[in-house]
């Protein structure tokens, strides 16, 4: 078996798919920023955590079911593997309906809690209400992707994302620039793009006879519990950057105002693509890790994990270099004001310090939930926003205000990576079959 070619067969399409999912937000920011300006950028930045929550629900349920599908398929338990798919499908639909009702009904109140007021609240509400109405398209679009990858066809998941991405760009141009629909146009384009992604994924599953809806009632409770146990980790992995975004926006509103929020909006659009690329390495290698774990093939598991760490760190460094070289152009891409663009150039190097550490944490987390060590992945995922909150409460009042908001995010990610290394060593000593070698 050629582990290297197998690794890249799964990982490269996954990276592209995850990168495109991050560019969805950038596309909206680009069109809205150039049409409305800083107020539009700030509105999308504040509303985005809600959209990210919707997508994270799909990712968590889909990945939770996909992990158990791969493990059971590797153990030759075909019927049980199919029931995990069916259970996940019904969970995706049910969660979609609940999400639409709650978010649409309480959108203004939720956005107010996230720090929106005035024109920003108005713009963000227009955006998020339409996103809520299309929640089922986003949840199905993100939830089906892990299954397509675990069926052994990462290319098709990439194709589905590309189809949705192109749809989003075309409709953003038409709705926001030609018909001047503003925030509502951007939101409509986003859910239409996700609808195309979901449709392509469902067509693939139906054509390949991988679309299962039957599950024995006696197994529902057990399977839902298993899916949620594993799914909480990728759910958290998708959501915690946006919990961090909420903290940054709230503290920045106090220390730096709208200018600081707009500044980080532009930075986060770009750097989150790098984060998603790193997650693409982890989730792209997950089907292989789960498969080799189910087959009890520890040597192959070690090789895949080693390649994932090395490749993720290389991508983090390369992404950081590209972002640093082009830092002066970031604000202009999103139609930011001159003052905001200057500030972006100043703070980008701060955030780039954390990229290699994020790479380590992302792969460690994926390795844990791919091999049924969800508890350890929970620790890594949720410690980051906790540390960030602590640093933001302590450092800015003592050492320099807004600049320490930026450094608090870096310190939280560095300490999270150190904890990841400790947990890996703990697994090695405890003989928990994590199987990672030194990198």
Question: Which residues are covered by each model-predicted region?
Answer:
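Short runs within selected transmembrane alpha-helices of multi-pass transporters and secretion channels
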Residues: 62, 131-149, 157-168, 186-201, ...
């Amino acid at each position: 078996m050629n582990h290297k070619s197998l690794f890249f067969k799964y990982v490269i399409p996954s990276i592209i798919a995850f990168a495109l999912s991050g560019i969805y937000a950038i596309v909206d920011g680009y069109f809205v920023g150039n049409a409305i300006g800083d107020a539009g950028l700030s509105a999308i930045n504040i509303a985005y955590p809600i959209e990210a929550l919707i997508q994270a629900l799909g990712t968590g349920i889909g990945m939770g079911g996909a992990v158990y599908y791969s493990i059971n398929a590797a153990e030759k338990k075909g019927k049980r593997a199919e029931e995990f798919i069916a259970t996940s499908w019904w969970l995706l639909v049910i969660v979609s309906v609940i999400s639409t009702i709650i978010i649409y009904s309480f959108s203004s109140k939720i956005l107010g809690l996230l720090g929106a007021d005035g024109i920003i609240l108005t713009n963000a509400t227009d955006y998020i209400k339409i996103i809520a109405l299309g929640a089922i398209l986003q949840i199905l679009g993100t939830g089906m992707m892990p299954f397509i990858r675990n069926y052994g066809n990462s290319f098709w998941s990439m194709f589905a994302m590309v189809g949705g991405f192109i749809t989003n760009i075309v409709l953003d141009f038409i709705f926001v620039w030609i018909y001047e629909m503003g925030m509502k146009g951007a939101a409509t384009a986003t859910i239409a793009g996700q609808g195309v992604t979901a449709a392509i994924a469902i067509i693939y599953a139906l054509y390949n006879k991988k679309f299962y809806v039957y599950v024995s009632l006696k197994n529902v409770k057990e399977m839902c519990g298993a899916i949620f146990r594993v799914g909480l980790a990728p759910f958290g992995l998708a959501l915690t950057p946006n919990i961090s975004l909420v903290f940054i926006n709230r503290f920045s509103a106090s220390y730096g105002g709208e200018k600081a929020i707009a500044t980080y909006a532009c930075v986060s659009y770009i750097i989150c693509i790098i984060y998603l690329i790193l997650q693409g390495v982890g989730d792209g290698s997950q089907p292989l890790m789960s498969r080799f774990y189910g087959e009890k093939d520890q040597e192959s598991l070690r090789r895949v994990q080693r390649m994932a760490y090395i490749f993720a760190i290389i991508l983090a460094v390369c992404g950081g270099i590209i972002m640093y070289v082009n830092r002066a152009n970031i604000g202009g891409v999103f139609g930011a004001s001159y003052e905001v663009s200057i500030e972006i150039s100043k703070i980008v190097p701060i955030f780039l310090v954390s990229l290699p550490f994020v790479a380590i944490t992302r792969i460690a987390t994926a390795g844990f939930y791919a091999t049924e060590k969800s508890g350890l992945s929970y620790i890594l995922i949720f410690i980051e926003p906790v540390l960030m909150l602590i640093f933001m409460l302590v450092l800015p009042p003592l050492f320099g205000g807004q600049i320490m908001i930026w450094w608090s995010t870096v310190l939280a990610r560095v300490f999270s990576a150190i904890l990841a290394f400790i947990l890996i060593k703990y697994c090695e000593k405890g003989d928990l079959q994590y199987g990672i070698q030194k990198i």
